[in-house]
């Protein structure tokens, strides 16, 4: 099993190219199920989750051609309307095939999801929404079995804001009969990216980027070309790394309009940020100042950036409070950071981080995707050598992170 070996204490300088967003690419790939025509996608990131999704779609009969970051999908031969447990257990985003399969083919059988070990994340909102559109749904032997002759438009109010729920119901609604209104819809940029692709395919969607999406169902969708948006979480991860370690790094192919809350917190920590249309420069010459924050839905502070900012706070001047409101089990990185010498205590949904003068390298273990990224940041800032085990979590959501960091001066290598 691969590990990362990191020698800490080296400032970062140079340029890093940001990859396409994992959380946009996964639903967008599933949109290939909605049409018999070709979908041409670019800026698709090289990630384990993307490879898993492509494998699942191939199993269903989707024709797929890959060339670098370009992926062409053709859904004319889809004949297997099932996502089996073996695929879904490694990646909960597999649930995103449910809406497209049901709305285009009238049937779907999808295993209940797995993915990271950070809480339950139930799929009941997906099921309730599809039932409101007329689907007959049974859950037996760990599978969701959904049937519908043609879905009917409906007004759906989700009990909670759910990103994958919004995406699934949006894809189901575009081919439904009549008008669907999604209230309390997720506003994440990745949802907007999916909606923009669907419109390019011929869907009729109003309210894109708001919490109220109005969809007029159409008979069929056609092919389209689309570039996946830049990954704001990867972008924030590298910004945090420079803020924690010090240096001067420019991020290319980045999106600046989706990172307001991260920019505010990094400036509060003492980083100097400048940005253009598709680049961000971060300069850090002093020890960061501690910043407190509370995770919440977009446009608030993303739960997917919580661990990385906590890593920066570990060696910051002062103490900070980090409140996690999205997932109930998302402080698993804390005990690993404390092994490096951090001073973090947990009280319920709050982590209290007392900044220390230095972290010292040690063997640590990644527990989930963003936790693994936070351990990389902590290791880069630590004195001496850190060995991070179980980095398959990192590969699920980061495109060759160690290669990108090496290019800006980090002493980091993948070892067996």
From Swiss-Prot:
Enzyme Commission designation: 2.5.1.7
GO biological process: cell division; cell wall organization; peptidoglycan biosynthetic process; regulation of cell shape; UDP-N-acetylgalactosamine biosynthetic process
GO molecular function, a single term: UDP-N-acetylglucosamine 1-carboxyvinyltransferase activity
Binding positions (UDP-N-acetyl-alpha-D-glucosamine): 92, 121-125, 304, 326
Pathway it works in: Cell wall biogenesis; peptidoglycan biosynthesis
Matching PANTHER family: UDP-N-ACETYLGLUCOSAMINE 1-CARBOXYVINYLTRANSFERASE (PTHR43783:SF1)
Name under which the protein is recorded: UDP-N-acetylglucosamine 1-carboxyvinyltransferase
């Amino acid at each position: 099993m691969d590990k990362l070996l990191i020698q800490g204490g080296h400032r970062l300088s140079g340029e890093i190219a940001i990859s396409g967003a994992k959380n946009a690419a996964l639903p967008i790939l599933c949109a290939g199920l909605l049409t018999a025509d070709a979908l041409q996608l670019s800026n698709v990131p090289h990630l384990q989750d993307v490879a898993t999704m492509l494998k699942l779609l191939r199993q269903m009969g989707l024709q797929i051609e890959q060339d670098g970051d370009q992926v062409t999908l053709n859904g004319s031969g889809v004949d297997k309307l099932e996502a089996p447990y073996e695929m879904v257990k490694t990646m909960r985003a597999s649930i995103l095939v449910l809406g497209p399969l049901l709305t285009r083919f009238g049937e779907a059988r999808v295993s209940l999801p797995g993915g990271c070990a950070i809480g339950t994340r139930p799929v009941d909102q997906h099921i309730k929404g599809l039932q409101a559109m007329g689907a007959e749904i049974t859950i037996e032997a760990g599978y969701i079995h959904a049937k519908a002759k043609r879905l009917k438009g409906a007004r759906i109010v989700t009990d909670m804001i759910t990103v994958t729920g919004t995406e699934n119901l949006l894809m189901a609604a575009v081919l439904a009969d009549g008008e669907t209104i999604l209230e309390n819809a997720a506003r994440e940029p990745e949802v907007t990216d999916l909606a923009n692709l669907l419109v390019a395919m011929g869907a009729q969607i109003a309210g894109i980027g708001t919490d109220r999406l109005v969809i007029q169902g159409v008979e069929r969708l056609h092919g389209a070309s689309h570039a996946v948006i830049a990954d704001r979480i990867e972008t924030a991860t590298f910004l945090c790394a420079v803020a924690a370690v010090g240096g001067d790094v420019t991020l290319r192919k980045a999106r600046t309009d989706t990172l307001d809350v991260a920019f505010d917190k990094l400036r509060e920590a003492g980083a100097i940020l400048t940005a253009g249309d598709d680049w961000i420069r971060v300069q850090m010459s002093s020890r960061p100042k501690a910043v407190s924050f509370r995770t919440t839905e977009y446009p608030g502070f993303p739960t997917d950036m919580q661990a990385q900012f906590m890593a920066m706070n570990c060696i910051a001047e002062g103490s900070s409070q980090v409140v996690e409101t999205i997932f109930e089990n998302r402080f698993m990185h804390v005990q690993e950071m404390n092994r490096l010498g951090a001073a973090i205590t947990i009280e319920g949904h709050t982590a209290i981080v007392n900044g220390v003068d230095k972290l010292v390298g040690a063997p640590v273990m990644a527990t989930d995707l963003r936790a693994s990224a936070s351990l990389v940041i902590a290791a880069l800032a630590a004195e001496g050598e850190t060995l991070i085990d179980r980095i398959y979590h990192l590969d699920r959501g980061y495109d060759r992170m160690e290669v990108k960091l090496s290019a800006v001066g980090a002493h980091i290598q993948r070892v067996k």
